[in-house]
C-alpha cells in the first residue's frame, strides 16, 4: 500500500515541501532564519487577530482602545507587547536572512531572491501602517511625514498624497484604510512566502561552500526539523525575555501621548528597523533626491545579482569581498544610529558619509573586489 502523504493531492504538496525534501548536508545555522520568519509571521497574524477584535480604527477612540486592550482585556497587555516586539523580531530575522543571502551568494537564485525583495517591501509597508494604528504622537507624525514624501513625485505628487490620506491631512479616513491594509497584507505576505518556497524548491537550497550539493543530500526530517526546532526555542526565549522584561525597549515614549496635530514632537523618527533608510533619506537636502535614495536603499538589493563579478559564489573563501561585506554591515549599523539622532552637526555629515559609503560598497566595491579575486585566482 502506498503511503498517503505520497498520494493524497494536498498531502503530496506538503510532503514535497517539508518531508521528502533533499537538503544539502552542510547548511549551517544561518539557514534557520527562513523557518524563524515563518514562526514570526504566525505570531504576528495570531496576536494581530486578537488585537483587531478589540481595536477601533477611529481617531477619537483608537488610542483609548489600545489602552483598554492593555488594561481591561485578559492578557491584552501580553498580546499587545507580543505584537509590537514581534515586529522587531521579524525585522531582525529578515535582515539576518537577507545578509546571509548576500554573504553566501543565494541571490544567484534570481526568482527566489526577487520574491524575497518583494516580501521585504510588503513587510516594511505592513509595519509602517501598523505603527500608525495606536494613534500616538509618533504614529500620527510618522504617518504625516512619510506619506508626505510622495508629494515629491513631479506633477501627480500632491494629488497622490491627498488620495492616500482621503482628505487634506492624516485623519479618520487615513487611519481606517491603514487598518484595512494592515489587516490584509500579512495574508498576502504568507501567500508570497509560499511562492518564495516554491521557487526555492525548484533549485534546492544553497550551502555555505556555494557549490552544487546534488551528490551529498540528506532528508529534511529528522535532521533539519530538529535543528529548526532548536532555533525556534532560542528565538522564543529571546522574544519572551524582550516582551516580559523589556517591552518598551524598542518603542518610542512619544507614542504614549495621544496624537495631537497641533503639537509636533521634537524628533520625528520611525521604528528602529527603518532608521537606516530614514538616515539615507535625511542625508540628501533635496526632497525628491531623498525619496529616490530611500527607495534605492532597498532596491539596490535587486541589483546585486546583476552586478556581481566573482566566479565563486560564496564569500567563504573571498577575503577581499568579506571585508567589503562587513564594511556594509558596519555602515548599516552606523546609519541606524544616525537615523535616531537629531538633525544637527556632527550627525548630518556622518549620515551623509555613511549614505555615500552604503551605495559605494554595494555598487562599486563589491564588484571590484570580485574582479580582483578572479585575477588573484587566475580565472
UniProtKB/Swiss-Prot annotation:
Transmembrane parts of this sequence: 33-53, 77-98, 113-133, 178-198, 226-246, 288-308, 320-340, 347-367
Binding site for heme b b566: 97, 196
Gene Ontology MF term list: metal ion binding; ubiquinol-cytochrome-c reductase activity
Matching CDD domains: cytochrome_b_C (cd00290), Cytochrome_b_N (cd00284)
Cited PROSITE patterns: CYTB_CTER (PS51003), CYTB_NTER (PS51002)
Annotated localization: Mitochondrion inner membrane
Pfam families documented for this protein: Cytochrom_B_C, Cytochrome_B
Alphabetical UniProt keywords: Electron transport, Heme, Iron, Membrane, Metal-binding, Mitochondrion, Mitochondrion inner membrane, Respiratory chain, Transmembrane, Transmembrane helix, Transport, Ubiquinone
Positions of a ubiquinone binding: 201
Membrane topology of this protein: Multi-pass membrane protein
Cofactors that this protein relies on: heme b
Co-factor binding comment: Binds 2 heme b groups non-covalently.
UniProt record, GO biological process: mitochondrial electron transport, ubiquinol to cytochrome c
Residues given in the record as heme b b562 binding sites: 83, 182
Gene Ontology CC entries for this record: mitochondrial inner membrane; respiratory chain complex III
Domain of life the protein comes from: Eukaryota
Main location: mitochondrion
Known function: Component of the ubiquinol-cytochrome c reductase complex (complex III or cytochrome b-c1 complex) that is part of the mitochondrial respiratory chain. The b-c1 complex mediates electron transfer from ubiquinol to cytochrome c. Contributes to the generation of a proton gradient across the mitochondrial membrane that is then used for ATP synthesis.
Assembly and binders: The cytochrome bc1 complex contains 11 subunits: 3 respiratory subunits (MT-CYB, CYC1 and UQCRFS1), 2 core proteins (UQCRC1 and UQCRC2) and 6 low-molecular weight proteins (UQCRH/QCR6, UQCRB/QCR7, UQCRQ/QCR8, UQCR10/QCR9, UQCR11/QCR10 and a cleavage product of UQCRFS1). This cytochrome bc1 complex then forms a dimer.
Similarity field: Belongs to the cytochrome b family.
Other noteworthy facts: Heme 1 (or BL or b562) is low-potential and absorbs at about 562 nm, and heme 2 (or BH or b566) is high-potential and absorbs at about 566 nm.
Annotated protein name in UniProt: Cytochrome b
Organism: Dipodomys ingens
